[in-house]
Amino acid sequence: MHVFRYLCRVMKRRDFIRTAGILTAGAIAGGALAGGCTAPKGFNFNKLGTGSGLRLSFRPYELELRHVFTVSSYSRKTTPGVQVRIDYEGYTGYGEASMPPYLGQTVESVCSFLSRIDLGQFRDPFRMEDILAYVDSLSMGDNAAKAAVDIALHDLVGKLMGQPWWRIWGLDPAKAPDTTFTIGIDTPAVVREKTRECTGRFNILKVKVGLNNDKEMISTIREITDLPLAVDANQGWKDRQQALDEIFWLQENGVVMVEQPMAKERIDDNAWITERSPLPIFADEAIQRLADIPSIKGAYHGINIKLMKCTGMREGWRMVNYARAEGLKVMVGCMTETSCAVSAAAQLSPAVDFCDLDGNLLITNDLFRGMKVVGGHIVLPDRPGIGIQPL
């Protein structure tokens, strides 16, 4: 009943009657997509099903990067992904799984997991807790695959409600911090080129460090711009005293925060750095899901929430609130993703301290129109769900 009360409050009467009719018909008839429904072009329907409710379909989609992307542990020119959709009574929710190497997931593992999901047993998409708890129960891992379903379900339900999720959560989009734009480890010439491309477009840059050329990277960028910088070591620093010395040098050169200085397993060393650092230290690889937060408290000043790590928007929103209650700073980030997953993560942006939501800007083959970055500012669309439109 709480959903109907919300709908009464936020919708025009005509829209409420239409949506209420959809929900009632779904509850009584079990959905009209059973039987003769065919998969959208290029998508594979999950044929596993015990009912006639929600319909899940998916297809692989490789993301092509504008530049070779290098961090302290690998380089790549593409990122494997899987596009997901959930169909219900003429409405479609879109989701996405993106699998950079360190997640340990592949197109094959994601598709295998998705093929085991029986959403047809659910005739009411508003049973979000039940649906996502069921999906989560199917394995101990597969977080990116779970995130794809979570994002698609949130998009679908937001569309049924006629509202974007930032509004459903009671957030003010004007409070979203500026997003960083990421510059990967590269030669000085390429770093200069990437930095020039950012001129006038962003107000803060994120720099990948963690190899033996960190100071060269920062100094090269400083030849072009004096914008504030965030740095991400991706667990690349090996000695805690050297890491701390470098952090003091970074502060002197306009860096405002540091992500994951040392290996996530070295909790004591990361805590030692955090205690002495003049800059806020954020956990990235060290934090995956909500249950991880107690284990990192005291070792970092804040956490980086990524939907592909935490299984999606439901848990991401819970992590924001839990971290705040524990006195931690919060950052929302992304992988290399289309505007689908980036726009989903952006729904959280008004509630966090830092944003790194540039994954869609790093690729050449986006599939959607969604959140925008204008003069470095995140602009959240007023469209319902996660605010995206297929291109």
Located regions from the model:
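Structural recognition of alpha->loop->beta junctions
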Residues: 246-257, 297-303, 347-368
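N-terminal export signals
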Residues: 2-8, 15-37
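Metal- or metallocofactor-binding catalytic centers and their adjacent structured scaffolds
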Residues: 47-58, 74, 87, 92-160
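Catalytic alpha/beta core domains of metabolic enzymes, predominantly
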Residues: 268-270, 276, 282, 287-357
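C-terminal segment of N-terminal export signals and the immediately downstream linker at the start
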Residues: 9-10, 32-67
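Metal-dependent enolase-superfamily TIM-barrel catalytic cores that perform enediolate-based chemistry
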Residues: 165-277
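Conserved, mostly hydrophobic/aromatic
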Residues: 84, 90, 149, 162, ...
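Flexible C-terminal active-site loop/helix
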Residues: 48-63, 81, 89, 335-391
